[in-house]
């Protein structure tokens, strides 16, 4: 049996379902795959398959996530759904499953709940660019005015966290009714059932409102330096994996981080001992750099397109602190705690200056298992940018995972 080839004919977009526990995220995920399977462009996945999500490890943290894929007439989607609330927090912060957009599921019967707010805040902090809302459990609400009220509440909540609350599409329906209809008749066609039609309407809103992500290869060039060699007669070679963009022989690049930024020319690109004209996102390459001595460059610096990234020492981060069971600390930590921040390829010591709760109030003590916003001051400047992931380590073990939510200086 030959392996199925991945046909890349449609643009690919990564999305996920977010929202409060028991509002129907997993049921909706099942409803989407079943509805699109009936329309001929997905493999139907039952609720049970999705809910029994396998464990994965991302940056040393165990997360349960279910991955399903499906297609609309215009796009191919990879969809992530997490069974537990803690899994969502960990997934969004570590970027284990990157989301180009998300479907926020809100129960029409209950309205926005604490985790609805928390997931919207997280989406904002970790840089999920666009949301579409599904008001679920519509079959449990008889009063049209109540639906309108919940919709208004959701829009206000979105606006509060700087999403365009007035413009985000809100589709109402019932994931469970759609699933039940499809169990009775797996071949429902568009126009035959109001509940499955609402799921199709939701997917059309996702198609139209969640923009296609910019491909890694189209972004400005960046490679984090992993190792440095000196080749006699040729000069200095820095090796690493190209994170984004592409680099050609003869191009000017900048070396950023730890010391003053320097500019030089790439005189060679090598991969597996072969010379290339250019290296691109995903390649592990060695770059030969003109006029750079071995001691001028070290692991932890980045090589990038001039002007595309700058070194910083102070930032705000949204952090998940590992529990004792996850291999994290057993005890709390306080202000002026000085762990290492593992950024791309290196550990940099930093001091945590303060902690802030979701409501903006100051927090004195951080416990294992907490999610917290912190302000960090690094001892040396490092190339960092908003949305970048990092780990917090202490004596070589990971005690937290975070994402840069704001650069301060």
UniProtKB/Swiss-Prot annotation:
Belongs to the TRAFAC class translation factor GTPase superfamily. Classic translation factor GTPase family. EF-Tu/EF-1A subfamily. It is an enzyme of class 3 (hydrolase). Residues 60-64 are annotated as: G2. PROSITE patterns: G_TR_1 (PS00301), G_TR_2 (PS51722). Residues 136-139 are annotated as: G4. This is Elongation factor Tu. Transmembrane segments: none annotated. Its main location: cytoplasm. One of its GO terms (molecular function) is translation elongation factor activity. The keyword Metal-binding applies. It comes from Crocosphaera subtropica (strain ATCC 51142 / BH68). Residues 81-84 are annotated as: G3. Residues 10-214 form the tr-type G domain. Its EC number is 3.6.5.3. Residues 19-26 are annotated as: G1. The keyword Hydrolase applies. Gene3D superfamilies: P-loop containing nucleotide triphosphate hydrolases, Translation factors. HAMAP family: EF_Tu_B. Monomer. The lineage of its organism: Bacteria, Bacillati, Cyanobacteriota, Cyanophyceae, Oscillatoriophycideae. GTP binds at residues 19-26, 81-85, 136-139. CDD domains: EF_Tu, EFTU_II, EFTU_III. Residues 174-176 are annotated as: G5. InterPro entries: EF-Tu_GTP-bd, EF-Tu_GTPase, EFTu-like_2, EFTU_2, G_TR_CS, P-loop_NTPase, Small_GTP-bd, T_Tr_GTP-bd_dom. Mg(2+) binds at residue 26. It holds the Pfam family GTP_EFTU_D2. It is found in: Cytoplasm.
């Amino acid at each position: 049996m030959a392996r199925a080839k991945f046909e890349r004919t449609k643009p690919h977009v990564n999305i996920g379902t977010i929202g409060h526990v028991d509002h129907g995220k997993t049921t909706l995920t099942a409803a989407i795959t079943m509805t699109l399977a009936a329309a001929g462009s997905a493999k139907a996945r039952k609720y049970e398959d999705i809910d029994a999500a396998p464990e994965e490890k991302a940056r040393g943290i165990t997360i349960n996530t279910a991955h399903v894929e499906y297609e609309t007439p215009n796009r191919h989607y990879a969809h992530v759904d997490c069974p537990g609330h803690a899994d969502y927090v960990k997934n969004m912060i570590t970027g284990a499953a990157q989301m180009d957009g998300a479907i926020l599921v809100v129960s029409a019967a209950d309205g926005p709940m604490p985790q609805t707010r928390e997931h919207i805040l997280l989406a904002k902090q970790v840089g999920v660019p666009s949301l579409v809302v599904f008001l679920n459990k519509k079959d449990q609400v008889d009063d049209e005015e109540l639906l309108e009220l919940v919709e208004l509440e959701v829009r206000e909540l979105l606006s509060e966290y700087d999403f365009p609350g007035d413009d985000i599409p809100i589709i109402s329906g019932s994931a469970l009714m759609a699933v039940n209809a499809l169990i009775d008749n797996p071949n429902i066609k568009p126009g035959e059932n109001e509940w499955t039609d609402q799921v199709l309407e939701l997917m059309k809103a996702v198609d139209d409102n969640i923009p296609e992500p910019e491909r890694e290869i189209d972004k400005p060039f960046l490679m984090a330096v992993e190792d440095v060699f000196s080749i006699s007669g040729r000069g200095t070679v820095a090796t690493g994996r190209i994170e984004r963009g592409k680099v050609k022989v003869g191009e000017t690049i900048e070396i950023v981080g730890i010391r003053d930024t320097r500019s030089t020319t790439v005189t060679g690109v090598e991969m597996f001992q072969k010379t290339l004209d250019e290296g691109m996102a995903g390649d592990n390459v060695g770059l030969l750099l003109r006029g750079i001595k071995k001691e001028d460059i070290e692991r932890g610096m980045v090589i990038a397109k001039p002007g595309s990234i700058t070194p910083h020492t102070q930032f705000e981060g949204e952090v998940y602190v590992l529990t004792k069971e996850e291999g994290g600390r057993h005890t709390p930590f306080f202000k002026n705690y000085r762990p290492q921040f593992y950024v791309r390829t290196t550990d940099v010591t930093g001091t945590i200056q303060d902690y802030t709760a979701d409501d903006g109030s100051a927090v004195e003590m951080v416990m294992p298992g907490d999610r917290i916003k912190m302000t960090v001051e690094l001892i040396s400047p490092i190339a960092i940018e908003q949305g970048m992931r990092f780990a917090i380590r202490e004596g070589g073990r990971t005690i937290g995972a975070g994402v840069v939510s704001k650069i301060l200086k």
